[in-house]
């Protein structure tokens, strides 16, 4: 079978769908020139493939090596339907490439008149200069130039030149496609790992920042008492299910080192510069989580969980809380598979009871509806996002577990929060597990809240 980039270029929708259905495939990977599958589908005008990639979570504003976004390519080649689709999904209309050109520069230069009109109607700036001091309208033929100026003026644009700023990108991050080779390795040679800084140590092991094959990674070294052949076999059998590359809101385990030869069983995952949602909310990272960012994080988590809940069988021993949600460089929340517990790791122990549903604290896992219990955990995350507080911060884990399970201890919803969020939280935290919604039911609710 040809590679995914060829399938997207040629518009082979059936092959693309089959490829996307394999959880080990990463739809945001790039080829040698940094083109993602979405770049190729947009360049070649493959509408059905573009739609499919976007619905599966392709990053809209991803940049190739020349800093072109999919919108630059669709505008250059005059694919009006795709330009409109990208704009519908919030593509950055004034994204700047390495030459300082925005998509409108290319639509004007290549004489894509209708596309140029659509871009201006959606807020593309007609007088933004590239590195060479040229505005998009300088690239257009006379009739189009006049038309675009007139349209822009009607929309309230100032037609004075906007000089090129080299500092345009300061304070934002450029979204690059991921290295497409990382999902090809499942067994990793421990000797190839370069351990740089210890990030954390707790009951379950050590967390390190490291390098592997030129990539920043996180290395999780598991502490396991009495390592045996049986535990080694379980580790080998359970690891492959954690390599989920096919959803943008799930952070896969890249690979593992078996012990022996490694001194301890070890997991490798992508480095996330902002750390976990817990770090972002409670440990003073450099950006503010306002209401709209909180809703976006909630939507990311709901989409990731909705996907995980489609897997049969479900991934066991996965605990949803703010320490097991990682924040990517483009502010995307991702459910971490490296935080899933293995069958040999302290069965029956709860290390974050504040996020655990009361029935899951009272019953054995096999007697609990895991999907409903996850929805309770999500409700606590919603509470955490709107209050910026750690749930039950003044109590020990043992007290929290006992009081949530036996005394009806619950997070109190403070006054003054959005009535929509408040209502959603109450629905998700229904005392009757059977009455809690499914994640695929709350995704559209969060999407509406985001649009508002």
UniProtKB/Swiss-Prot annotation:
Q: Which UniProt keywords apply?
A: Acetylation, ANK repeat, ATP-binding, Cell junction, Cell membrane, Cell projection, Cytoplasm, Cytoskeleton, Magnesium, Membrane, Metal-binding, Nucleotide-binding, Nucleus, Phosphoprotein, Repeat
Q: How is it modified after translation?
A: Phosphorylation by PAK1 modulates ILK subcellular location by promoting its nuclear export.
Q: How is this protein annotated for GO cellular component?
A: cell cortex; centrosome; chromatin; cytoplasm; focal adhesion; lamellipodium; nucleus; plasma membrane
- Which GO molecular function annotation, any one, does this entry have? integrin binding
The protein's matches in InterPro entries, at most eight in alphabetical order, are given as: Ankyrin_rpt, Ankyrin_rpt-contain_sf, Kinase-like_dom_sf, PK_ILK, Prot_kinase_dom, Ser-Thr/Tyr_kinase_cat_dom, Ser/Thr_Kinases-Pseudokinases
- Modified residue N-acetylmethionine is at which positions? 1
Point out the coiled-coil segments of this chain: none
In terms of superkingdom, the source organism counts as: Eukaryota
Span list, region PH-like: 180-212
Q: What is this entry's stated membrane topology? A: Peripheral membrane protein
Which ranges carry the Protein kinase domain?
193-446
**UniProt keyword annotation of Phosphoprotein present:** yes
Q: How does it assemble?
A: Component of the heterotrimeric IPP (ILK-PINCH-PARVIN) complex composed of ILK, LIMS1/PINCH and PARVA; the complex binds to F-actin via the C-terminal tail of LIMS1 and the N-terminal region of PARVA, promoting F-actin filament bundling. Formation of the IPP complex is dependent on protein kinase C and precedes integrin-mediated cell adhesion and spreading. ILK also interacts with LIMS2/PINCH2 and with PARVB and PARVG which may substitute for LIMS1 and PARVA in the IPP complex; PARVA and PARVB compete for the same binding site.
Domain comment (free text): The kinase domain is likely to have lost catalytic activity but retains ATP-binding activity. ATP structurally stabilizes the kinase domain and promotes stability of binding to PARVA as well as focal adhesion stability. The PH-like region is not required for assembly of the IPP complex or for localization of ILK to focal adhesions.
Q: What is this protein called?
A: Scaffold protein ILK
Q: Which organism is it from?
A: Pongo abelii
- Organism placement in taxonomy: Eukaryota, Metazoa, Chordata, Craniata, Vertebrata
